[in-house]
Regions:
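N-terminal ligand-binding/catalytic initiation module
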Residues: 1-196
Length: 197
């Protein structure tokens, strides 16, 4: 890369890949832009009392496409999480699901946090509060938006999120299906035990 030309951001790289694919297709007017953009991105900021003070956290959940319900995509915990990243990852989830004919739209979420900086009980409080903020907006829901583990999260975090959803939706008989990647003893299924990263 030359000194006068900056490297594209992750989001810009996804758009460049999309542009190359679209150039090979005959899409009706307006459809290209509809496919390119995310339907919605939600930013949540919440506080949790930890270590004698209120700690404020920022999280995101982006829904790229709801052409098929539910939407599906991981939740990551990392200090570099931002809106552009979750929107790009949500778009990639839509494309991946479409290519392999999984009947789901794409979504992705993240919490700007270094999970290694927190004790397990603190991380549980943070995760449950994040899940609460998402669930009250139907951004965790078995028939609408189903998160999964991603970088910095795993079975433990998915179990906490599923339990928080269940506590908020006591009459939902499908509450265990609100996330995937849970441990078997929390309603998960045999299979992958590690997430991306």
């Amino acid at each position: 890369m030359s000194a006068d030309k900056k490297e594209p951001s992750f989001r810009e790289s996804v758009d460049l890949m999309f542009n190359r694919a679209v150039a090979l297709m005959d899409l009706s007017p307006g459809l290209e832009e509809k496919i390119r953009v995310c339907n919605a991105t939600y930013t949540v900021r919440f506080g949790v009392r930890l270590r004698g003070q209120i700690q404020t956290f920022t999280g995101y959940r982006s829904v790229h496409s709801e052409h098929m319900d539910p939407v599906k995509g991981g939740i990551r915990y990392a200090m570099a999480v931002n809106q552009d990243e979750v929107e790009a990852l949500a778009a990639l989830m839509t494309f991946k699901c479409a290519v392999v004919e999984v009947p789901c739209g794409g979504s992705k979420g993240g919490l700007r946090i270094d999970p290694r900086e927190w004790e397990e009980d603190e991380l549980e409080l943070i995760t449950r509060r994040f899940a609460y903020e998402l669930a009250k907006r139907d951004l965790i829901h078995p028939s609408q938006n189903v998160p999964a583990p991603d970088m910095g999260t795993g079975e433990r975090e998915m179990a906490w999120m599923a339990d928080q959803y269940r506590r908020m939706n006591t009459t939902d008989i499908n509450s265990r299906a609100c996330v995937t990647g849970k441990p078997v003893n929390a309603g998960g299924i045999q299979g992958r035990t590690a997430a991306t990263g």
